[in-house]
Amino acid sequence: MKFTHCLASVALVSVLGACGGVQNQVTDVKGPVDYVNPYMGNISHLLVPTFPTIHLPNSMLRVYPERADYTTDMLNGLPLIVTSHRGSSAFNLSPYQGDKLRPVIAYSYDNEILKPYYYEVILDDEEIKVKYAPSHQSALYQIEYSQQDKPVYMMINSRNGAIKAGDGVVSGYQQLENNTRVYLYIESDVAPIETGILADGKIDVDKKEAEGRNACAVMHFADGTKTVNLRYGISFISEEQAKKNLQRELPDYNLRALAEKGRQIWDKALSDIQVEGGSETDKQVLYTSLYRVFERPVCISEDGRYFSAFDGKIHEDNGEPFYTDDWIWDTYRAAHPLRLLIDEGTEKNVIDSYLRMAEQMGDMWMPTFPEITGDSRRMNSNHAVATVADAAAK
């Protein structure tokens, strides 16, 4: 198989079709993103497996199904944001029909479709169909209910933090480690008939705010509601910034257009490496591996500012995006040298972020495992130094 580095983006061919709303049509032309198999590596025999992550390249908002690995037959609610690569996520979304409300609903599931830019699944016991597409700091869910004789609910669980229920709006935060918070602002295109806080398995409409473990807001929609679209923004700065991120990125509830835009972004990013010859399997392995390179680090600059857990402060980025959640022990050998060849600008910003981390921690030591919640100082040696040395040599 012959490799070619192509700095110019290739022509993009949309394969988003009418079948299922956003699934790929059969086409004679496949883009690099069509070879990506996010399920590859999802079963681990020793360490942590890979996860089928839905996100845009190096973007702050990442999700994957709430399950242990590919063999797990249940989902613990629906995801809203991953806050640590292969580590943890924040918040839970639980659409539900019935009278046994809980902060997180465990779902059996089937007919899952998962692309880097799109997710679809049937929650079969609940008879609910879910579609999802992300942007950089916001995302969109489409929830289709089908049981006509049961009430229609949506639960938003903060897990460990605070939540507020308004008229078609829910906002709040989840407390992470090292004085770090992730904030949420979520809107519905369907006005609920009532909102409140989950208490003892029921919706308390007289209560609009809650704090602590499993603080959970509830939206109750009119009987017979078939489809609810939810759009949300996330932030590590504030609830207000989460709202701004949503408004900047998602002007409407058009999931099809959002998924198509995500596909084009992925195809352009992966097209920096072109191949000739080889088998379909070879191309799957190559482009899936390249897709993994874009999982981390993530850019957490929001409108020119970012929260740094390395000193617990909000900083201006002065036009240079701030990246973290890298786990350098995993990435210094291949991911960083490759990124320098195919995306020199991003690699420069990543290395600049390391230097800012060292300054913010006050000891001028380069980070070893930079995460959203700061540097966890794992693994021996300091591989950021090797990363900088390699970049300087190139």
Annotate each predicted stretch with a short phrase.
Residues 1-8:
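Bacterial N-terminal signal peptides that target proteins for export
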Residues 17-18:
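C-terminal motif of bacterial Sec signal peptides marking the signal peptidase cleavage site
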Residues 11-14:
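Repetitive helical segments and hydrophobic/amphipathic motifs
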Residues 24-394:
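Accessory carbohydrate-recognition regions in carbohydrate-active enzymes
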